[in-house]
Amino acid sequence: MKKIIGSLKDYLRNELKPGFLFSILIFMVAYVFIEYRYKCTNWLDLKYHDTITDTIIQYLIFLFPFTVGYLLYSSFYNDWGLWHKPLFWFLLLFAPLVFSLRSFINYFSNEIYSLLPTGRTAFFYYRCTAVVVRDLVIVIPVFFYWWIMDKNKMPFYGFTLKNYDTKPYLVMLGIMIPIVVLASYQGDFLHQYPKGFNLDPLSIDNPKDQKYFFIYELFYGFDFIFIEYFFRGFLLLAFFRHFGWGCLLPMACFYVSIHFGKPLGETISSFFGGTILGILAIRTGSVAGGIIVHLGVAWLMEFTALLHKIL
């Protein structure tokens, strides 16, 4: 825990200007308030898209806070030079595009169904396949960027155990346990979770079906590995090499926007959790600890929600 606190103190004292943090918080409070007060994205399903227009809108939802974060950084640190760099513009536009295309698999759902086994397990196979394809959509373009730009400079954006220590992350995960348990009593939480137990017509109450639910939970967790890799790996380690600590809070703003539609508490906490994990990822050069925390919290949310459903 001392390492976590020490890293946070060092960032707050030496890297962060209070005005920058305050402006980011004001912007994100307004952005989240407008979304949850007026339900601006209710008509847009952030997971399943039927038109190119929906994907473009999702891209803009991600791009907007990411761009504002960098604009605020430039304003408070008087660093407008990065806006004259073609590489910055490429990364600024490229990153939200890659993440918004995760849902591209849904354009081909009928084709995928035709290739998978039929019967009661069809939806199970589809959801597992969708997880793999969504993650490949992230990994492949970012891997090509790393191969061209950073292969000789760093491991694959945080996929390393060098400088990694498990203990601080286990402490963080332990702190999250009572928070998740308390959240699990909220109606909006139980409306969202457990996500892994919607495999109609399979039923968790049927002993013959139960194995499919737990297999899917493994795939569900696989998804979080690559979300962590994208946000704390690519968006920080690739950007930090060129733009320094200014990349941290714009990443957190972007990260909040992917939580729209989820319980409000989860969306708010994503900013602070993403920032803390981001500081540690930059300090260690590894996303391994972030994966432990993110995956552990995700499965904990599934498990606590399941207990409420079956008890």
Regions found by a protein language model. Name each.
Residues 5-24, 49-56, 77-98, 118-131, ...:
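Interfacial transmembrane-helix boundary/kink motif in multi-pass membrane proteins
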Residues 21, 60, 89-93, 168-174, ...:
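Hydrophobic alpha-helical transmembrane segments
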Residues 26-37, 95-105, 176-186, 252-260, ...:
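Aromatic-anchored segments of alpha-helical transmembrane domains
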Residues 36-70, 79-147:
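Alpha-helical transmembrane segments in multi-pass membrane proteins
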Residues 67-75, 138-152, 222-241:
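Transmembrane alpha-helical segments in integral membrane proteins
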Residues 100-137, 143-223, 311:
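Juxtamembrane helix-loop-helix connectors linking adjacent transmembrane helices
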Residues 158-170, 226-250, 279-286:
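Membrane-interface helix/loop boundary segments of multi-pass membrane proteins
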Residues 248-311:
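Functionally important transmembrane alpha-helices
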